[in-house]
């Protein structure tokens, strides 16, 4: 097969259609003789047909399927680079003839594009490739099996050609133009030339070597007429075009017989090696490139198909749904006529039509029957299933948010790829695209605009409603019907009493129309003077003050003899103005001189008590705006409700809460970007108030009424209440219990109370904190005898001091100045306000409010039980001692040592059954039952009795009581900070007796401090033995397990203690003033078992009943 010229990337299509002119053996080849040679050229096309061309007539003429006249002048420098030096340049418009020798080394080294000749497929060729051979060349090619004949010299190289043809290695091939047999660059690269869209020729050979037979299968060239054949068929590379279908038939003008020409030969080992070295890499690269192109094209087609499919599915579903709605809602009226009207009317009409269509039961196709029916038609179910499947398939195939993003809606692509310019944007999720943001912003604007339009239309409706109401009120108002002008004779009578009522307004110098014009005709000088002054202003309008014409002014100075300077100045002023007096026809008459015929009583409308006109539930605004001039609004009814303290609703939306803090932020129309940054900073700065639990605020350690410097008492009552609220917030851990407990306030309301304190009180807050933590009190001799109290008892004393001990007798008994700030503050919260100084005088109503609020705020605390004075005024409250029982702690015990002890086998096992515990508690239960039965059998006494006081269930007369009106306990000495809960409070008859009362003999001794008998005489059932106090020792430590049972030690003392208890009750009962009312005997008091291991004397604990 003849080799072709190398492929040129910048050449036209003619560069691949090269004519090879072979000279006869007997002539010497030169450029001139080659041109004038009259031998015909044979054109062999790819389809194997033989054509005849006359080169002498038209060198550029060739008979192809699409013969065209082409200009080859531009190919001279490109082709000349591959020719030898003895070849002249090719003239224009002539067929290219191979006139030199191409060496494979020069071609391969000088042109690196030979391996890329596959790229020039359809771009360079528009028709099938054509090879030209001379008849002499074909004749020599036919002698393949014979020995090489001596060839004619071609370009003076016949000797070299003869030598090369005599070699045994080259017997099967014929060398032309004296050159070595070159190798083909890429012989169509594995058969891909025939499969390209344009059927171009992909490669050429660098020398004029024609093998008689095809080479190796993978190194031969395939010519195929079918342009759409298989592109990678490597097994069909054996030259079917030149062996079978490309056989040359006898020419019409040829003298030699070319029929049955077959290109046969043997394989060349050298060409196989060279083919395999260059062709393998280029073929693989071309295949990969071709595959990538096909894949990209298929991807684009698939995307277009998905878009078309999604649009078709959408159009189909919209069409089906539209038909379904048209069929279902066919009974709806036409609303097009209502569109020019207001939107409100259109909405109402549409809603009414929908309700009517939904309630229709006449037709089976109505919406109500469709919605109420349990079954759906088969066709509708089928459409629903298919529509859902199609939509889901389209979404999964087309939506990038489903295919390319993770489950959280975020893409897994790195940030560098996200910022890369990609017009397709397959990796960017929908929420990150600008279209999504634009749609979200547009939806926000549309929603706010719709809300604004709805509210504007609602306001217009309200304005029309208010206008109608105003017109109705004016229509129903009615006019005042006056009588006719009275005759002049009646005017004279009327003037005399009216003359003294003529008054003026000093501020405006205007007179009131009270005298008619006919008065000027009378002859009295003073009357004429008055009428003259009145006629000048008879028809003038009076200036209203606050909407009311003021008629109650001082008497006119003109009536007084001896005119003042104001009256003279007023008279001269009127004369200068030359005011025209009213006409004397009597038409302009004062209204007060005419009789009233009819006057309809008008309704008085008060805006404060008007019912809201709107039917909507009004939500009170907690923040009063700065533009609120009128405190009462007739529309919303928010008159005096806004004066309440602001309470932020934390469950409300964010914009609504921000609108309460800043009036520039609208709760609906404002965008998130409109919120000032300062509001966000405030929420960050004040976050500790929301995050810090209120219970973590440490209570004050100690509170004593120590004398401090007096504070100015000029603060108002509200400031005192706020200060009291501030102090009570520090005492939140001290709790109060009331017989009518109310719900506790939340932590947020406590914060609001603290935040409601004015700035003056916030400045004084550190002072109050120093007041709550005072220095130790001055040493008192009685203070050393007191038992140490814990902090909870001190707080209970202070709180009870707040509520119950702030009366005048209590304040008089204290050793502190009455103008102490805390005492003055506590005195305002008393139920019986007795002021200690002029600065602490408040009313009873204002003093009771903080007490009620404080009782509502506190909750019941089981660790700090305080009984108010209103509940137990005549009893003594004693702190329970079982709180301070020392319990043993856990310790590690070696089990091996316990197992080895011999006493463990003889140790008695404790009985823990229910029967054993019931037997142990039987005595205590009987005693408790007897005590409660005795309490219910006591005869009832009047609670507010003046001559009797109930201390332990019995009545004792007050003989020398200093304050017999109210049963008050003794006023204690509060100079030292000991517990107020143990001063002089007896136990309530209804309250259960503490276990400690039965664990000791009833020795009547005083507990804490001396009674102030001078201030108040308290007669108790137990006498006071002395001023010294018996110290109370705690329980002694015990070692467990106990060596002896304490039951045997206490059985001996049981009878003696019962007898002592009976004697004590008889003695106390004999002190009553009434002999007829014999008090019932008390049940026997059985003490509990002693828990001490030491003598019984140390276990005796004195106590009061």
Curated annotation (Swiss-Prot):
PTM sites of type Phosphothreonine: 1003
Residue ranges annotated for the PEHE domain, each copy included: 884-1035
Residues found modified as N6-acetyllysine: 104
Subcellular location field: Nucleus; Chromosome, Centromere, Kinetochore; Mitochondrion; Cytoplasm, Cytoskeleton, Spindle pole
Stretch list, region Disordered: 145-211, 225-263, 399-426, 733-857, 938-1034, 1058-1105
Modified residues (Phosphoserine): 249, 268, 991, 994, 1045
Biased composition (Basic and acidic residues): 741-753, 780-804, 1008-1019
Coiled-coil portions: 283-314
PROSITE patterns: PEHE
Tissue: Expressed in the brain.
Region span, Interaction with KAT8 HAT domain: 910-928
Residue numbers spanned by region Required for activation of KAT8 histone acetyltransferase activity: 850-882
Effect of residue 910 to R: Abolishes interaction with KAT8
InterPro entries, per the entry: NSL1, PEHE_dom
Gene Ontology CC terms: histone acetyltransferase complex; kinetochore; mitochondrion; MLL1 complex; NSL complex; nucleoplasm; nucleus
Amino acid composition bias (Low complexity), ranges on this chain: 827-850, 975-988
Glycyl lysine isopeptide (Lys-Gly) (interchain with G-Cter in SUMO2) crosslink, residue number(s): 262, 331
Position of the signal peptide: none
Source organism, top-level taxon: Eukaryota
UniProt disease annotation: Koolen-De Vries syndrome: An autosomal dominant, multisystem disorder characterized by hypotonia, developmental delay, moderate to severe intellectual disability, and distinctive dysmorphic features including tall, broad forehead, long face, upslanting palpebral fissures, epicanthal folds, tubular nose with bulbous nasal tip, and large ears. Expressive language development is particularly impaired compared with receptive language or motor skills.
Function noted in UniProt: Non-catalytic component of the NSL histone acetyltransferase complex, a multiprotein complex that mediates histone H4 acetylation at 'Lys-5'- and 'Lys-8' (H4K5ac and H4K8ac) at transcription start sites and promotes transcription initiation. The NSL complex also acts as a regulator of gene expression in mitochondria. In addition to its role in transcription, KANSL1 also plays an essential role in spindle assembly during mitosis. Associates with microtubule ends and contributes to microtubule stability.
Name the record gives this protein: KAT8 regulatory NSL complex subunit 1
Organism expressing this protein natively: Homo sapiens
Lineage of origin: Eukaryota, Metazoa, Chordata, Craniata, Vertebrata
Gene: KANSL1
